[in-house]
Amino acid sequence: MKVSIIGATGYGGLELIRLLHQHASVDIATLHSFSAQSETLATFYPHLKDLEASPLEKINSAEIIEKSDTVFIATPSGIAKDIALPYVDAGLNVIDLSGDFRLKDRQLYEKWYGKSAAPIEYIAKAEYGLAEFRDKKEARFIANPGCYATATLLGIAPLVKSQLIDPTSIIVDAKSGISGAGKVPSASTHFTETNENMTLYKMNSHQHIPEIMQQLTKWDETIPAIQFSTSLIPITRGIFTTIYVKPKNPITQKELHTLYKSTYENAPFVRIQPENVYPTVKQVTASNYCDIGLAYNEKTNVITIVSVLDNLVKGAAGQAIQNLNIMANFAESDGLRFIPVYP
């Protein structure tokens, strides 16, 4: 399969390149960048020397359609809504890593992203690509989920889908490494601001909130809202999400683990920790795994779920490739079978 990557010089694009080099059924046909053309990626990223020689090109939709079966769009939000359309119309596989096609309500997108929304007919065509819970596995146009959304939804899905929790009780405390803010630096992501520091940001206003709510209410329409906070922590990669919910009825630790184990029995990239063991960010670094730990406090009647993943892999490029594997009828783990980087 021939693929093109638009946005190849960003962190998400670079991860796509790294991972696709290990995929036996995929060849990279073209690489595209808004910020640089004609040079090779190794000009900007020396770690790719002798590994990726394709030149960076301007976006030429006719050329991409001619040379590719699949297009990955790894650009900031607000770009894919315009540039994805010809590839969808041409019948190519299109996987968008931005938020442009995730929300089915155009007004919600414009409220939370502060940008004009994509045409409604294309939003309707896009399948939300939470890989473990895809509704239409044959879909060829995928809105890849956000990193926080993936960690939260995988962490809470078994309980919500079983309607075992008080729908008003969901509290999510999510923390991200600095790469989650993207490649372009800002005052808040400057080394001197992030090193030995922790910063709460976008309190009650993170753009992944409506995305999470959209999926949760598909599973349980009685959920009215969630309390969701996000923080930056001084690591390069990783999402560490702690979720608190109250069950409708008391539940044992064994019942909790049995539910999660059965839900993810056939999910190659979700690993449920043993009882009283909780995951760390380092155990999933540079991998497509989402590791989940569970606890129940009988005194407070609160379930705590800890969900960790690499925001650039399972939270972005890795899940995008997992979605490609599903749509192409490859093994779901093709190109993604590797051990996390440790320590």
Swiss-Prot record:
SMART domains: Semialdhyde_dh
Pfam families hit by this protein: Semialdhyde_dh, Semialdhyde_dhC_1
CDD domains, A to Z: AGPR_1_C (cd23934), AGPR_1_N (cd17895)
Active-site residues, record numbering mapped to chain: 147
PROSITE patterns: ARGC
Pathway recorded for this protein: Amino-acid biosynthesis; L-arginine biosynthesis; N(2)-acetyl-L-ornithine from L-glutamate: step 3/4
UniProt keywords, alphabetically: Amino-acid biosynthesis, Arginine biosynthesis, Cytoplasm, NADP, Oxidoreductase
Top-rank taxon, per record: Bacteria
Single GO cellular component term: cytoplasm
E.C. no: 1.2.1.38
Subcellular location: Cytoplasm
Gene Ontology terms for molecular function: N-acetyl-gamma-glutamyl-phosphate reductase activity; NAD binding; NADP+ binding
An individual GO BP term: L-arginine biosynthetic process
Recorded catalytic activity of this chain's protein: N-acetyl-L-glutamate 5-semialdehyde + phosphate + NADP(+) = N-acetyl-L-glutamyl 5-phosphate + NADPH + H(+)
Presence of keyword Chaperone: no
InterPro entries on file: AGPR_AS, AGPR_type-1, NAD(P)-bd_dom_sf, NAGSA_dehydrogenase, Semialdehyde_DH_NAD-bd
Group of enzyme by EC: oxidoreductase
Location, primary (coarse class): cytoplasm
Family designation: Belongs to the NAGSA dehydrogenase family. Type 1 subfamily.
Stored PANTHER family: N-ACETYL-GAMMA-GLUTAMYL-PHOSPHATE REDUCTASE, CHLOROPLASTIC-RELATED, N-ACETYL-GAMMA-GLUTAMYL-PHOSPHATE REDUCTASE, CHLOROPLASTIC-RELATED-RELATED
Role, per record: Catalyzes the NADPH-dependent reduction of N-acetyl-5-glutamyl phosphate to yield N-acetyl-L-glutamate 5-semialdehyde.
Name of the protein this chain belongs to: N-acetyl-gamma-glutamyl-phosphate reductase
